[in-house]
Amino acid sequence: MISKNIESDSITFQLSTKEDSVIRTDNKILSDFLNKLENLVTRYREEIPSFTRIYHKEKLISETFNEVEKKSDSSFHSEILCIRNAKEKLKTRYLADCMLITSLEPCLMCAGTILLSRIPKVVYLLPAKQGEGISSLSIEMIYSRNFFPELFCIPTEISKNAFKSFFKVRRKKFN
């Protein structure tokens, strides 16, 4: 199976493709991520609350927030910006030793960038609607590629509430 749900209240969770290559992520990484997400959501109220970090061998190397509204460009998703920054910092085309963590399941556009960047582990805190995220790629698509990341959904109330409040405010604004 390519997608796993992991309880966020556990003390630690492990993400691994092989027994000999385990990336251990503890609650500190998740806690720091959620604190930063909450801070950014209050600062950037016009943007969808999508926040992404990339870790290279367990070290934070890149973090970005959505800039779609700020730049008036639909390609400025946090995942794509974060991947660009990470590649620049590491001076590489592929992010093979990296883990991407993001507040919302990557959309199909971001999924393409993740696949082409060969990021082996993708963690997201809120699933996308059916058919709109990386986990909805077809079996044919997955097996036609020589690479596909492991996907982990770790649902959190903070991420869920950030998106709920964002869309509640948006609906009021346009009604």
Regions found by a protein language model. Name each.
Residues 68-81:
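A short, polar/charged loop-to-alpha-helix boundary motif
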Residues 83-95:
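A contiguous binding-surface segment within folded domains or other stable secondary-structure elements
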Residues 1-47, 106, 112-175:
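Zinc-dependent deaminase
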Residues 92-104:
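Immediate flanking context of iron-sulfur cluster ligation sites
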Residues 61-68:
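Short beta->alpha transition motifs characteristic of CBS
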Residues 49-56:
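Short beta-strand scaffold segments in enzyme catalytic cores
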